[in-house]
Amino acid sequence: MALGNCTTPTTFILSGLTDNPRLQMPLFMVFLAIYTITLLANLGLIALISVDFHLQTPMYIFLQNLSFTDAAYSTVITPKMLATFLEERRTISYVGCILQYFSFVLLTSSECLLLAVMAYDRYVAICKPLLYPAIMTKAVCWRLVEGLYSLAFLNSLVHTSGLLKLSFCSSNVVNHFFCDNSPLFQISSSSTTLNELLVFIFGSWFAMSSIITTPISYVFIILTVVRIRSKDGKYKAFSTCTSHLMAVSLFHGTVIFMYLRPVKLFSLDTDKIASLFYTVVIPMLNPLIYSWRNKEVKDALRRVIATNVWIH
């Protein structure tokens, strides 16, 4: 971990979102509220799916894992970001930075693959309804979940191993509110060409796995739905897909902007805003998107509330 007289720093300094002291406390309160809503919404959805047997279906198994990923995602990033609003010296240990980066890549990759699997699930449910119970069994669903987490883990391991080989001799100030690759590459004393290539190749594969799977699935879904004669049937089929399309668009639109482009094409301040959206805001929006117009989730919530009221 040394290069000549250069030794790896024991800590990094995070620049945070802003240096304006007047904005520190208002931003702290805003993002604390967002983080609280994120945890309550995602953990609440996980609990609801767990206790209501009507939601023990493949679609909700994947949604439960998406909620877990979003809650973990937000927890990896937000608490440290909140601390930067309150601390004068915004430090994170070298080990803490590496662990944060590893967790961040793991969860980002997991979400990409989860969205792809959810698109395939909707395709089978709508285009092959009679075969759906046989194809998407609980065992198959959990194997898919285990497989995507394993792939995400390997992806994160590759990127983190590359990061561990970099030296940071000239600066330890990370111009960001968390340890992401772009600001770390900016202050590296070593060549980051291989790292940037790995980010592009692996990032493209994980993003495209979802970006390609989703449109292909929805082409077949649309072709199937237009043949449905009843308006109620068409509405029910499309209503289960709308939430997924919104989640995919929000997540991948930001990720493509962030990672599938040359690192120096935009300023780090622009990256901060984009990062803020998909690491803090999207994890809050996802459970709301999937629950807002979802009759099954609303009915399950009513049953749970009614049961608790009756018991008490």
UniProtKB/Swiss-Prot annotation:
One GO cellular component, as annotated: plasma membrane
Extracellular side: 1-26, 80-100, 165-205, 261-271
Phylogenetic placement of the source organism: Eukaryota, Metazoa, Chordata, Craniata, Vertebrata
InterPro entries named among the record's database cross-references: GPCR_Rhodpsn, GPCR_Rhodpsn_7TM, Olfact_rcpt
Compartments it resides in: Cell membrane
Glycan-carrying positions: N5
Membrane-protein topology: Multi-pass membrane protein
Protein name: Olfactory receptor-like protein COR5
